[in-house]
Swiss-Prot record:
Primary location group: secreted
Cellular localisation: Secreted
Organism lineage string: Eukaryota, Metazoa, Chordata, Craniata, Vertebrata
Family statement drawn from the similarity comment of this UniProt entry: Belongs to the vasopressin/oxytocin family.
UniProtKB keywords: Cleavage on pair of basic residues, Disulfide bond, Secreted
Pfam family, one: Hormone_5
Native organism: Anser anser anser
Function: Neurophysin 2 specifically binds vasopressin.
Alphabetized Gene3D superfamilies for the sequence: Neurohypophysial hormone domain
SUPFAM superfamilies the record matches: Neurophysin II
Protein name (database record): Neurophysin 2
Domain of life, source organism: Eukaryota
Amino acid sequence: ALADTALRQCLPCGPGNRGRCFGPGICCGVELGGCYVGTAETRRCAEEDYLPSPCQPGGQPCGSGGRCAADGVCCSADTCAADASCLEEGSERAEEAAEKNLTVLDGSAGDLLLRLMQLAGRQQGRQPGLL
């Protein structure tokens, strides 16, 4: 009975069967460089609906019930989205994302500092008792 409920790996798909099905119209793989959605490469994935046992795509859990499907991509059975938690460590895209986050952080910190200085300057220029 346990073998009946065990999840199997989803069907291979895409060019050279280098991807895995994530839904009836989604085929993804690191070797594919991303995902095919609703294309000829996903036709085989529709067969999953007719197989008696459920499958679970590989990859770490991500997003809302999805799994990491390719570098920086999280997919559920219905959709795919960019997800930084799916970036492979050390990949060029992971390094770019880290740099962008650092830049955003630096920009926010700079904006905050500038705003605080402006507020401090206004406070110094005011006379006591005036609003």
